[in-house]
Each structure stands twice: as structure tokens, then as C-alpha cells.
Amino acid sequence: MKLKILLHSSTYSSSFDTEEQQLPGPSTSYSEVTEQASPTRRRKPRKSDATSTTSPETEGVRLRRRRREGKSGPGSGETPRKRRRGGGRGGGETELGSAPSPAEVGSRHRQVERQGLSRLGLLQAEARDPPMILLKGTANSLKCWRYRKVNSNCCNFLFMSTVWNWVGDCSHNHSRMLIAFDSTDQRDAFVKHNLFPKLCTYTYGSLNSL
């Protein structure tokens, strides 16, 4: 009986050893699977990969630049020149003429158009047509006034005529006297700083020549 038990225990232990030997150990494929299943590291985005976002203000500036380039024309490096146009009847460009020659002084018999002319151009145009003042009054008052102005060394006029009258004019203030000036500025200064005789009227005008 004892022999049977010993034999049975020996066979059981030997079979247990063989089973332990047949158990599969940890294979290398399992380690590879675990390594593959491990989470991979994420790549940090580079500066070149990041998309550049533009603000709406910069987009508006770009659109305005494109519109300006479209209006001025592509490839036009020069800005359009501004032309100054006069307000006269012709509507053409205002060009500053040359200074009048001595023969051209007083050659114009029409009033100068002031629109579209610079100060220098206006003076040059008026030099061809000397401005004048026509005084109307009594003969005695005009003669006395002229005598005082001539003897006072008043140099703010060009010429002063004698007292004259139209033939057939029998009115009370029938006497006339002409005063010529170099420019309208001189004429305006003369009217501003001088008093005319009592009950005397004046008017502006110009002559073809003196």
C-alpha cells in the first residue's frame, strides 16, 4: 500500500514538472506589442507650419491699396498732374503770359477778367490797359482840388488831366477830369487816402492809350 502511494506521488510530481516545463514563458512578441501600443509623442507645430492669421484692419489696408493701384493704372509710377483751370468762358488752362512790352501798354480797351488769374498775371494784364478815374463836378471845385494835389507832390497817380466838359452838356456838374494810374492797387490806394471835392462823383474806367 505504501509503495502504491509513493509511486503515485512520484508520477504526480513528474507530471507536474513536465507541465511546468511545457508552460509557455513570456514571448518577445508581447513586448513588441506593448511597445507599439504605447502612445507616440506629439510633434510640436513649427513656426513655418502655423498658418498666418491677418487682422481685418490689415486686410482693409490691402484692399484700399489695390483700389488705388487700379484707379491710377498698373505700372504707373508717376502721379497725375493737377491742372489748374480758370473760371472763364473758355474753361481752358490758365497760363501766365509774358510781361507786356512798352508798345503793348494801353493796347487793350476791354476790362480784364479777374477769374483764373494770379496776382502777377492780373498786374500784367492790367498793364496793357491803364486804369483811370473820371471825376464829375463843378469846374471851380475840380480846378482847386487838382491844384492842391499837383503842388503837394502827390506821387500816387500816373497822370492828371485838366478840367474839361462835353460839348452841349449844360448840367450843373458838367465838368470832367481824368486821373490815370499804373495799376488798380494804386488806384484803390488813391481813393482810400484822398478826399474828393464836395458834391463830386467818380467812376472807374480805362482807355486804349493815354
From Swiss-Prot:
InterPro entries: E2/EBNA1_C_sf, Nucleotide-bd_a/b_plait_sf, Papillomavirus_E2_C
Keyword annotations of the record: Host nucleus
Any single GO CC term annotated in Swiss-Prot or TrEMBL for this entry: host cell nucleus
Compositional bias ranges of the Polar residues kind: 24-39
Cellular localization per UniProt: Host nucleus
Record's signal peptide: none
Region (Disordered): 1-112
GO biological process, one term: regulation of DNA replication
Gene Ontology molecular function, alphabetical: DNA binding; DNA-binding transcription factor activity
Family indicated by similarity: Belongs to the papillomaviridae E8^E2C protein family.
Its job: Plays a role in limiting the replication of viral DNA in keratinocytes. Recruits the host NCoR/SMRT complex to viral replication foci to mediate repression of both viral replication and transcription.
Protein name in the entry: Protein E8^E2C
Source organism of the structure: Human papillomavirus 4
